[in-house]
């Protein structure tokens, strides 16, 4: 949890992390997103309830890549709550070809491009291309006012470009179980 001016709070909560599933909640006072939905919808709902949030409070799901430990609950959350999903073109295509996720309304997919900022509410999000054995994996750098952190999962290798993208952070969450 970050603290600063009352309106600049930025929070991060790990709901699940590990080879059996990954899901992180990131939020400000007014807007919240999930990074990955790699556990059941029920476990996501329970995890959010533990931090006094509801699935309906989420403004979207940022998908890092298409492996099941990152998308297992994606279809359920999309169908149940109509949550928009943000992912690269390669990841979206791979998700659409993953039968266990089930049918997802194509309107819920929003294509993102590495190194191109996009905004969800008061959160500015920058996808960062990373090395991993997936279609088109990314990490996420998230900023609200003067607070910035990044969430990096399943990083295969790193190079100078990734190191540069991660400069100037207040916090780095590096998931290192891969």
At which residue positions do the language-model features occur?
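Short amphipathic alpha-helix with an adjacent loop that forms part of the alpha/beta core around
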Residues: 48-52, 118-121, 162-165
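Active-site neighborhood of phospho(di)ester-bond hydrolases with catalytic His/Asp-centered motifs
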Residues: 35-38, 58-66, 85-89, 150-153, ...
């Amino acid at each position: 949890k970050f603290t600063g001016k009352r309106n600049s709070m930025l929070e991060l909560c790990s709901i699940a992390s590990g080879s059996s599933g990954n899901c992180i909640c990131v939020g400000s006072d007014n807007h919240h997103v999930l990074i990955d939905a790699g556990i059941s919808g029920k476990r996501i709902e329970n995890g959010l309830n533990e931090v006094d949030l509801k699935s309906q409070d989420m403004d979207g799901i940022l998908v890092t890549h298409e492996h099941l430990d990152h998308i297992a609950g994606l279809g359920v959350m999309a169908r149940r709550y109509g949550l928009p999903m943000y992912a690269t073109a390669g990841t979206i295509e791979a998700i659409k070809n993953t039968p266990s996720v089930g049918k997802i309304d194509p309107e819920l997919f929003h294509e993102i491009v590495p190194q191109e900022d996009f905004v969800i509410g008061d959160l500015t999000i920058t996808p960062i291309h990373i090395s991993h054995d997936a279609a088109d994996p990314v990490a996420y750098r998230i900023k609200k006012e003067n607070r910035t952190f990044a969430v990096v999962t399943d990083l295969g290798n790193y190079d100078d470009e990734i190191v540069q993208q991660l400069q100037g952070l207040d916090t780095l969450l590096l998931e290192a179980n891969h």
